[in-house]
A protein has these predicted regions:
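Structural recognition of the beta-strand scaffold that forms the well-ordered cores
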Residues: 49-54, 86-93, 139-144, 193-197, ...
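Surface-exposed substrate-engagement region within the catalytic domains
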Residues: 169-308
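Metal-dependent phosphodiesterase/phospholipase catalytic core, i.e.
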Residues: 93-95, 105-172
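Long, acidic (Asp/Glu-rich), low-complexity accessory segments flanking structured domains
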Residues: 15-83, 96-134, 203-205, 273-352
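Sec-dependent N-terminal signal peptides
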Residues: 1-5
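C-terminal motif of bacterial Sec signal peptides marking the signal peptidase cleavage site
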Residues: 8-11
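Acidic (Asp/Glu)-rich catalytic clusters
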Residues: 43, 129-137, 186-188, 260-261
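Short, aromatic/basic amphipathic alpha-helical patches
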Residues: 154-166, 206-215, 326-340
Length: 352
């Protein structure tokens, strides 16, 4: 354990209910105004791996789906950005799109399982790129995989070719690309979209990195790997999404919050509160799971036993929604608690 982490732990104990960073109160005010540029306020040499980053699971479903099954978000990508979401789980598959009379071409399109969203991958990237152009102090993370459940559009070689071409085209501008390194800093990431792909579309990533060793087990894994062109990092990962054990899911979420807080710089963490209870991801089962887990993590981050360190990337369902029917989802409160955690302890700085 380094001296910087010892300092963080000691300072956190002294200021449990008061933000260490003076701009934390400003951040809360910005959120209420719908313009939450919280990354802009962080020091350039802070390690990105130790940040607390709110993210959305199957982010594009909030822009609309062809039917409600598998809809995990209520807000559009733009609305998610406005509330401070900076990590986006996107699932591009592909489909044929009409380009003229009797002319069709394959195009990357976002799905959740067999459910088609109303958003193309190009459109989703454009939303993020436009926001970064307007807010160059921010950055975004895309966590993606090949969603290949369609019986018609499931050929891996087609997807590989489409993705390789897209990530090197003008649709993914060169100024948004960045190669992954474990020790990336906030300053290096400003204005960029870091792409972490769970499926390798080429021998080496065109931008960002590939992720291997993904796990859906209740206990998660501390041995997944993020591999960039020239460097790799350990990934601590919890994505227990088909929740047969409510208490086990909550315990795993809180365990990975602690693991993230105690990790050395360069170790990354992705922690999902998302998922569903029961046997199928229906609207009700997704919201019940969100209520169970979002409240638990919110209470943990705002309570007296909160971890004295970053949470890593937290992916949740129904961001921005406080309640829906009988469910208290805390989709508004949890992302802000994650954001505020960046200002609750001294960040470890590269070179210091």
């Amino acid at each position: 354990m380094g001296a910087a982490f010892v300092l963080a732990a000691a300072s956190c104990e002294k200021t449990l209910d008061e933000p260490i960073n003076e701009s934390a109160q400003e951040t809360r005010a910005l959120t209420k105004g719908g313009d939450n540029n919280w990354i802009t306020q962080l020091p350039d040499n802070a390690y990105a791996s130790q940040l607390s980053i709110p993210g959305t699971h199957d982010a594009a479903t909030g822009d609309g789906t062809v039917f409600s099954l598998g809809k995990t978000q209520s807000l559009s990508l733009q609305e998610q950005w406005d509330m401070g979401i900076r990590a986006f789980d996107l699932r591009p598959g592909y489909k044929k799109v009409r380009k003229g009379l009797f002319k069709y071409e394959n195009e990357l399109h976002i799905y959740h399982g067999i459910v088609e969203t109303k958003t193309s991958f190009r459109k989703a990237v454009q939303v993020l790129s436009d926001n970064l152009a307007a807010n160059p102090g921010e950055f975004a993370i895309i966590i993606m995989r090949f969603e290949n459940d369609s019986p018609l559009y499931n050929k891996r070689d087609v997807w590989n070719s489409l993705m390789s071409s897209f990530l090197t085209s003008s649709d993914f501008p060169a100024e948004r690309r960045i190669d992954f390194r474990p020790d990336l800093t906030v300053g290096e990431l400003r204005g960029k979209i870091l792409v972490l792909s769970r499926d390798a579309y080429a021998s080496t990533p065109s931008t960002g990195a590939f992720v291997s060793g993904w796990s859906h087990s209740e206990s998660g894994t501390t041995s997944a790997v993020i591999s960039g062109k020239n460097a790799s990092a350990t990934l601590q990962l919890q994505d227990y999404y088909s929740v047969g054990n409510k208490e086990g899911k909550i315990a795993s979420i809180l365990n990975f919050a602690d693991l993230a807080a105690g990790a050395e710089p360069g170790v990354w963490t992705i922690n999902h509160t998302s998922g569903y209870v029961g046997k199928i991801g229906s609207d009700l089962s997704i919201k019940q799971n969100a209520e169970n887990n979002n409240i638990a993590l919110y209470n943990y981050l705002t309570g007296s036993s909160k971890p004295c360190g970053g949470t890593g990337i937290i992916l949740l369902d129904h961001a921005g929604i406080h309640s829906s029917g009988p469910f208290d989802i805390y989709g508004d409160l949890l992302p802000q608690a994650v954001i505020d955690n960046n200002f609750a302890f001294p960040l470890r700085l590269k070179g210091e």
